[in-house]
A protein has these predicted regions:
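Alpha/beta-hydrolase fold nucleophile elbow
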Residues: 49-62
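Short beta-strand immediately N-terminal to the catalytic nucleophile in serine-hydrolase-like folds
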Residues: 57-59, 84, 180
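Active-site loop signature of alpha/beta-hydrolase-fold enzymes
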Residues: 21, 89, 220
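Loop/turn elements at helix/coil->beta-strand transitions in domains of secreted/extracellular proteins
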Residues: 9-12, 51-54, 76-80, 174-176, ...
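Cap/lid segment of the alpha/beta-hydrolase catalytic domain
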Residues: 1-47, 94-95, 223
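Glycine-rich nucleophile elbow surrounding the catalytic serine of serine-hydrolase chemistry
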Residues: 59-69, 187
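Accessory cap/linker subdomain of secreted extracellular hydrolases
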Residues: 1-3, 8, 71-172
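C-terminal subdomain of alpha/beta-hydrolase-fold enzymes, centered on the catalytic histidine
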Residues: 153-223
Length: 223
């Protein structure tokens, strides 16, 4: 559906899957391999006979994160980004105010555990959050989920989060970006911060062409 949407508008549409999900090989670990895999995809595109030197990226949530991961590579043809309900700091989203965001983190872990999305039953969530320790909430809900454990346990581990969020991506951004946020979305505070950082710290051409749209929506319903 997404591919046809862009193709009807004259674009060559390429849909990149996530490592270890659906038909993609490898091990699934959210957010960790997106830069490596994104760069490899851009390098592949450059070698195609139909490539005209221009790449535009679009995606929401973790697929918005995938764009930020390669936002410093205009040398690979990247010209612009459209990031919806995602920011440069999953660390801040998961640990906003110093407490782990159990609703967001556990819901996503249950839904994405394995090679395909699964239904999240509220009874599973209710059962999981009624007891301690927090790091075992995944076990109570569905079974051991290593990346969820890492999110909980590594709140103060800068090296861990740098592998996911990078370092100052709003400063190293090299192409204009359209940010779309929701008033009821957990990424809203960090998306607003991203926008302010870009317009004050990115180069002039990028800063003047970057925009932020905020609308009356949440997260999952928009993804």
């Amino acid at each position: 559906v997404i591919g046809r949407y862009w193709a009807r508008r004259g674009y060559t549409a390429i849909i990149q899957g996530t490592r270890g999900r659906y038909g993609s090989g490898g091990k699934f670990y959210p957010l960790l391999y997106e830069r490596q895999d994104g760069i490899e995809t851009l390098e592949w595109i450059r070698k195609q006979p139909w490539f005209d030197g221009n790449v535009f990226m679009w995606g929401a949530s973790s697929f918005g994160h995938s764009q930020w991961c390669v936002s410093d590579r205009p040398d690979l043809g990247l010209k612009a980004l459209f990031v919806q309900i995602a920011s440069t700091s999953f660390r801040r989203m998961f640990h906003d105010g110093g407490a782990f965001s159990l609703e967001s983190g556990l819901f996503w872990a249950i839904r994405s555990r394995g090679s395909q999305d699964r239904e999240v039953k509220m009874t599973n969530l209710d059962q999981a959050v009624q007891d301690f320790p927090l790091v075992e909430a995944d076990d109570r809900a569905i079974g051991d989920t290593p990346f969820f454990n890492d999110w909980v346990l590594n709140q103060n581990d800068n090296k861990y989060w740098q592998k996911i969020d990078g370092v100052n991506r709003t400063h190293t951004l090299q192409v204009p970006i359209l940010l779309m946020a929701g008033w009821f979305d957990p990424f809203l505070p960090t998306q607003i911060e991203d926008f302010n950082q870009v317009i004050h710290n990115a180069n002039d051409n990028v800063a003047t062409e970057t925009r932020l749209i905020i609308g009356p929506w949440g997260h999952a319903n928009e993804v």
